Amino acid sequence: MGQKVNPNGFRYGVTKAHNTTWFAHKATYGSKLVEDVKIYKFFDKFTRKFQIGKVEIQRDLNNKVSVFLHTSKPAAILGENGTNIKNLTVALQKHLKNKKLDVNLKVLTIKEPDLNARLLAEMIATKLENRESFRSAQKIAIRSALKAGAKGIKTAVSGRLNGVDMARTEGYSEGEMKLHTLRQDVSYATATARTTYGAIGVKVWVSLGEILQGDRTFHHASTKKN
């Protein structure tokens, strides 16, 4: 039986740039890696509230950490006169428990939220928690993505759908979805819906077409030919 690989990890360094960019000495590498995991988990709690579709981390050698928050609601994160972003920065520093760390949060706007796999997955999960039909929730996400310009989209929900005793997986797929083609720009994300019948897993794949060498949308990565 064929094994499925994560489409994001499959393309990192080829047609996708890594979400984390920094260099470290061998002695401090482990602690910085743990800090990155804590940062990602910290903002996972605010994904739905602030519509955060992607988090990127950059570090320099002076212990300065820049966290880029890609969101469709930048005003919600910034708050009035930037008060909310300041509170988030303080809360993150307390969460990391490292006073020497200089954390700087930067907000970037997602122009097309309907093409972001993470936001689509969270939208489906929210509808499932609101007891909407899992079929209609997936179809709404598919229509939104295709209308926004996606070349293809695939969704899947897994769990006790509609409260039945036996868990199962159901999904839909429209358009092209070449998961084995590395130059295919595929965005993949998962989400979890906490319902009264238990947890329901949500997976979303969004295809934005092929990335050709020299294209401006090549995500700062390149392929080499032997």
UniProtKB/Swiss-Prot annotation:
Assembly: Part of the 30S ribosomal subunit. Forms a tight complex with proteins S10 and S14.
Q: Function of this protein?
A: Binds the lower part of the 30S subunit head. Binds mRNA in the 70S ribosome, positioning it for translation.
Q: Which family does it belong to?
A: Belongs to the universal ribosomal protein uS3 family.
Alphabetized HAMAP family for the sequence: Ribosomal_uS3_B (MF_01309_B)
Pfam families documented for this protein? KH_2 (PF07650), Ribosomal_S3_C (PF00189)
Q: What would be one Gene Ontology cellular-component term for the protein?
A: cytosolic small ribosomal subunit
Domain named KH type-2: which ranges?
39-109
Report the Gene3D superfamilies cross-referenced here.
3.30.300.20, Ribosomal protein S3, C-terminal domain
Q: What is this protein called?
A: Small ribosomal subunit protein uS3
As one GO molecular function, the record gives: mRNA binding
For this protein, the record's InterPro entries field holds: KH_dom, KH_dom-like_a/b, KH_dom_type_2, KH_sf_prok-type, Ribosomal_S3_C_sf, Ribosomal_uS3_bac-typ, Ribosomal_uS3_C
User: What is one GO biological process annotated to this record?
Assistant: translation
> Which keywords does the record carry?
Ribonucleoprotein, Ribosomal protein, RNA-binding, rRNA-binding
Lineage top rank: taxon: Bacteria
